[in-house]
Amino acid sequence: MLYELGRLAPGSFDVFLDGVVVASLVRSGPHHGATWSAELLLDLDQKDRPPPFRRLEHQFATFEEACDWLGNPEIASEP
């Protein structure tokens, strides 16, 4: 799956799949020690979730870890 990130605000991204927003990626907490979460926007049955989503929400220690999990998506330039 090829994902793309669209920056909304510092620490907040839309996650696109085939041009459609399917999830959000957001930072929780201050920069130092912040965690990141990727959350599907629709409550899909597990069999219908796009890989690598096995749950509706996944937690990560760093932005880089989240990007690795998403297959190193391209970050779209800001409008």
Question: Where is each model-derived feature located?
Answer:
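Short N-terminal "domain-start" leader segments
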Residues: 1-44
